[in-house]
């Protein structure tokens, strides 16, 4: 069991590192050309550095305190947005984007060496927001990086999109689980949800209300980068059942679009 858990952490960590590298300019790109400087602005790079530093400190700080649930981890990190943004502003100081990018690359190398070491990080660690499972720290920060990719139009690994969808569906199951609507996101996940207000409570088999969408669309909906009515109108959601549009009420699961609009406003 321990070996299987360690392999699972390694797979997640590998996806985490690959995603982080996609969000940084290529090493030794100095100075950044105008297009790169616009894409990889100082606040973008500084926020990544905050994520890297937070993760490095967290995965090297074991704890025996009972970890919080994934949904609470996501919510507590949302509440800490202003704190993280303030740290990012301190990181920027008077540095250029090029110098920040070089620092971020070195920091990411350090994170990678810790995450992929054998043995790996402890199972439960002390984070910025309290005791968490190391996998939940990686999932929460991977979700933040996937949302950064959406915000900036940067392609990220498909594994990161799939993992982020699974994180979001787990949060939905914890916060809005029920037996009225089945939301399918093949091949990533499926989750059964309660209706908003009154609705049938199905006890066996597939609920009578079914919605299905692609992972990228689900990620956009769940992080606030798109909205249910427009995705329905565009044919990017297939739905059936009289209560299926109640799904709109659970989005966004976490409003990363609003967070990044504020953090990156000066880039």
What are these language model-derived features?
Residues 11-15, 19-27, 60, 100-191, ...:
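Acidic, aliphatic-rich amphipathic alpha-helical segments
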Residues 2-9, 29-51, 89-100, 124-141, ...:
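Alpha-helical scaffold segments that form or flank carboxylate-/histidine-based iron centers
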Residues 47-50, 54, 141-151, 171, ...:
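Short, hydrophobic/amphipathic alpha-helical patches that form generic packing surfaces
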Residues 68-72, 166-175, 244-250:
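Short, mixed-charge aromatic SLiMs
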Residues 64-76, 130, 134, 188-189, ...:
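Charge-rich, acidic-biased intrinsically disordered regions
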Residues 177-219:
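Glycine/small-residue-rich hydrophobic helix-like segments
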Residues 2-12, 16-27, 54-56, 61, ...:
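C-terminal interaction segments
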Residues 53-109:
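Short, helix-capping/interhelical loops that line the mouth of catalytic, cofactor-
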């Amino acid at each position: 069991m321990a070996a299987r858990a360690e392999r699972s952490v390694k797979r997640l960590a590998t996806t985490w590192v690959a995603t982080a590298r996609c969000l940084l300019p290529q090493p030794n790109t100095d100075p950044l050309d105008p297009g790169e400087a616009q894409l990889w602005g100082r606040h973008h790079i500084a926020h990544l550095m905050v994520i890297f530093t937070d993760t490095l400190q967290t995965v090297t700080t074991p704890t025996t305190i009972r970890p919080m649930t994934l949904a609470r981890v996501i919510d507590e990190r949302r509440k800490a947005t202003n704190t993280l943004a303030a740290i990012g502003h301190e990181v920027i100081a008077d540095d250029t984007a090029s110098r920040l990018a070089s620092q971020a690359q070195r920091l990411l190398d350090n994170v990678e060496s810790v995450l992929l070491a054998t043995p790996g990080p402890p199972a439960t660690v002390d984070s910025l927001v309290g005791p968490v499972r190391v996998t939940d720290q990686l999932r929460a920060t991977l979700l933040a990086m996937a949302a950064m990719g959406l915000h900036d139009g940067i392609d990220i690994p498909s594994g990161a999109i799939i993992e982020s969808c699974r994180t979001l569906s787990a949060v939905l199951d914890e916060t809005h689980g029920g037996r009225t609507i089945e939301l399918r996101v093949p091949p990533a996940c499926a989750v059964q949800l309660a209706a908003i207000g009154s609705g049938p409570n199905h006890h066996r088999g597939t609920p009578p209300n079914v919605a299905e969408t692609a992972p990228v669309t689900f990620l956009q909906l769940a992080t606030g980068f798109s909205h249910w009515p427009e995705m329905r109108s565009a044919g990017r959601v297939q739905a059936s059942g009289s209560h299926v549009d109640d799904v709109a009420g659970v989005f966004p699961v976490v409003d990363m679009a609003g967070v990044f609009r504020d953090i990156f406003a000066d880039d």
